[in-house]
């Protein structure tokens, strides 16, 4: 008798994706982040569902309802902090996952990569709207500042902003629609992640060497299931430590002050995972220019397959490209730091230089280094 997992219509899909999937024998721990992102998404959907049971999306009661969750709901504080810090873990895994893709040339799977870029935008939109929901000072002013950026779009900008707001300022209508979108988007993300996997399994996984691994495949289970479980345990331990020991470490104290349209906080800044993009936005004195730079700072990832000039796929055997890659990582840390600083000297000039370096590395220096390495191969 044939095994049920190979004949049952539903089990067959699970089997070909997670059990009998042929995987390269040499993929490292950098390939763990896909499964970790799946775990993060499931965690966010579950904790979010329980939070939504107690949350009210009304400007008068939103802040109080979050306080009520933390004080009165059984383990409400745990659910709330798991959700808030789960978002941080989600972004850490996302950045590492994208970084792995850049380093090992995974962007050469174009469909998978482009769905991934789309997923990144969707997760960023979801996180932004989620940050607005507690209706603290930073929620309100963050929503005001970021939505206002759309007014930089010529001709239709102002109308577009008022349409998104549902009025002439960020108010009840804005909060209600943000809650609705924040609830639905994770399910769209889950569907997109399914498409992401579908395209990945059309080609098979990349591996650290960047060479074809068709001659040396091993089944996903038990080798990589056990490896993913180890990664999951590390993720859960890190998240638990953060939630139970310092749940507010990555948050903003201003968000414990109820939203007040008459009082602007001294430093308006988003959550830490948006700071690099926020620094790029602020480094350009022109509003439209800043918005374009902000969007392009993420959209530039979609250009990666076209900017690949090397004869080798992976950076594993390309020392010059490796140096530039780690310079890019250092530059992103610098941008993240600058995004959290006030707009004053010397932070302005550091931010501008870091922004120029960011685009220069991706658009010019890395493709040029690859061409140089191609010539070194002839020696």
Curated annotation (Swiss-Prot):
What is the scientific name of the source organism? Talpa europaea (European mole)
Positions contributing to heme b b566 binding:
97, 196
Name of the protein in question? Cytochrome b
> Which controlled-vocabulary keywords does the entry list?
Electron transport, Heme, Iron, Membrane, Metal-binding, Mitochondrion, Mitochondrion inner membrane, Respiratory chain, Transmembrane, Transmembrane helix, Transport, Ubiquinone
A GO biological process held by the record: mitochondrial electron transport, ubiquinol to cytochrome c
State the annotated membrane topology for this chain.
Multi-pass membrane protein
Q: Into which family does the record put it?
A: Belongs to the cytochrome b family.
Query: How is the co-factor bound, per the entry?
Result: Binds 2 heme b groups non-covalently.
Per UniProt, subunit arrangement is: The cytochrome bc1 complex contains 11 subunits: 3 respiratory subunits (MT-CYB, CYC1 and UQCRFS1), 2 core proteins (UQCRC1 and UQCRC2) and 6 low-molecular weight proteins (UQCRH/QCR6, UQCRB/QCR7, UQCRQ/QCR8, UQCR10/QCR9, UQCR11/QCR10 and a cleavage product of UQCRFS1). This cytochrome bc1 complex then forms a dimer.
Checking InterPro entries in the record gives:
Cyt_b/b6_C, Cyt_b/b6_C_sf, Cyt_b/b6_N, Cytb/b6-like_sf, Cytochrome_b, Cytochrome_b_C_euk/bac, Cytochrome_b_N_euk/bac, Di-haem_cyt_TM
- Annotated residues for binding of a ubiquinone: 201
Tell me, in one coarse class, where this protein mainly resides: mitochondrion
Which Pfam families did the record assign?
A: Cytochrom_B_C, Cytochrome_B
Alphabetical GO CC annotations of the entry are: mitochondrial inner membrane; respiratory chain complex III
Cite the source lineage.
Answer: Eukaryota, Metazoa, Chordata, Craniata, Vertebrata
Q: Which residues cross the membrane?
A: 33-53, 77-98, 113-133, 178-198, 226-246, 288-308, 320-340, 347-367
Tell me the compartments it is located in: Mitochondrion inner membrane
Function recorded in the entry: Component of the ubiquinol-cytochrome c reductase complex (complex III or cytochrome b-c1 complex) that is part of the mitochondrial respiratory chain. The b-c1 complex mediates electron transfer from ubiquinol to cytochrome c. Contributes to the generation of a proton gradient across the mitochondrial membrane that is then used for ATP synthesis.
Keyword Heme appears in the UniProt entry: yes
The yes or no answer to whether the keyword Glycosyltransferase is present is: no
Extra remark: Heme 1 (or BL or b562) is low-potential and absorbs at about 562 nm, and heme 2 (or BH or b566) is high-potential and absorbs at about 566 nm.
């Amino acid at each position: 008798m044939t095994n049920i997992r190979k004949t049952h219509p539903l089990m067959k899909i699970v089997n070909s994706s997670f059990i009998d999937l042929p995987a390269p024998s040499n993929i490292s721990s950098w390939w763990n982040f896909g499964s970790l992102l799946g775990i993060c998404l499931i965690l966010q959907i579950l904790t979010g569902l329980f939070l939504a049971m107690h949350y009210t999306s009304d400007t008068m009661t939103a802040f109080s309802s979050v306080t009520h969750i933390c004080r009165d709901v059984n383990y409400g504080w745990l659910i709330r902090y798991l959700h808030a810090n789960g978002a941080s873990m989600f972004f850490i895994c996302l950045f590492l996952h994208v970084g792995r893709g850049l380093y090992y040339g995974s962007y050469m799977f174009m469909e998978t990569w482009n769905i991934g870029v789309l997923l990144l935008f969707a997760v960023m939109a979801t996180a932004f709207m989620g940050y607005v929901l507690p209706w603290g000072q930073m929620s309100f002013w963050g929503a005001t500042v970021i939505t206002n950026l759309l007014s930089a779009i010529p001709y239709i900008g102002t109308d577009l902003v008022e349409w998104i707001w549902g009025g002439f300022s960020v108010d009840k209508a804005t909060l209600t629609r943000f809650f609705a979108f924040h609830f639905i988007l994770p399910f769209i993300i889950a569907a997109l992640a399914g498409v992401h996997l579908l395209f990945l399994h059309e080609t098979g996984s990349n591996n650290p060497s960047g060479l074809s691994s068709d001659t040396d495949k091993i089944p996903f289970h038990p080798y990589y299931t056990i490896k993913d479980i180890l990664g999951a345990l590390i993720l859960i331990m890190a998240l638990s430590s953060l939630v139970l020991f310092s749940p507010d470490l990555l948050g903003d104290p201003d968000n414990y002050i109820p939203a007040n349209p008459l009082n602007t906080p001294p430093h308006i800044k988003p959550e830490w995972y948006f700071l690099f993009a926020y620094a790029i936005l602020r480094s350009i004195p022109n509003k439209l220019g800043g918005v374009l730079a902000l969007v392009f700072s993420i959209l530039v990832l979609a250009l990666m397959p076209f900017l690949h000039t090397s004869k080798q796929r992976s950076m594993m055997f390309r020392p010059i490209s490796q140096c530039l890659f780690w310079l890019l990582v250092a530059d992103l840390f610098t941008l993240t730091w600058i995004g959290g600083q006030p707009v004053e000297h010397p932070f302005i000039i550091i931010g501008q230089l870091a922004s120029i370096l960011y685009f220069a590395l991706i658009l010019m220096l890395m493709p040029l280094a690859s061409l140089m390495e191609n010539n070194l191969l002839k020696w």
